[in-house]
Amino acid sequence: GGMVRNVRAENLSAALINEILERHPEVNPDEVEDVIWGCVNQTKEQGFNIARFISLMTPLPHRCAAQTVNRLCASSMTAIHSAAMAIMSGQGEVFFCGGVEHMGHVPMDHGVDPNPSSSLFSAKASGMMGLTAEMVAIQHRVSREDQDSFAFRSHQRASKSTTSGRFSREIVGVEGHDQEGHLQFCLEDEVIRHDAKLDEIAALKPVFNPVSGPVTAGTSSA
């Protein structure tokens, strides 16, 4: 597991809201109209309107509303859209928007029972992003070499931006545990490979189509 394997989804999100309020004392918690949080697999610790449980762990008043929205990968974006529409229609002025998905605690397919006949009405591999990437690579002729080079450049850019502090205003540190179980304060994305090497990425085996697929762990997002 990763750094936050022992931290629940609600705690992760509550820490974010608490830090934002701490960084921006000009924001009055009493003026927050709604907490709108995106989440796809709304079960276990992410169930029963996780946005409400997150809100209760912050200085926001109990009268502040909270809702959890689901539009799969666009859930957090939909949360922002919903808040924007509410502001434009005069239903409030201050909102907290975000999203959470703790796949270490709630796996992507946990409790999911897709209808087999739905494949008759949807695109091939539309239910799995890994195979979708494989199909896109075939349709648009994106070679393995191009993908590896793109991934390598992404790690280089992420490393440079992180070490130079470009993301410091966008990241809220949280307590977690390293691989040895020691308590540690996490201040950066732990999947960035600061020492990434193109030849090592090129040597990785495909994970979604093991026969001839070009997509590997090195070219997949975390």
Predicted regions and their residues:
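Conserved catalytic cysteine-centered active-site region
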Residues: 7, 29, 39-93, 123-134, ...
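Flexible glycine-/small-residue-enriched beta->alpha junction loops
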Residues: 88-140
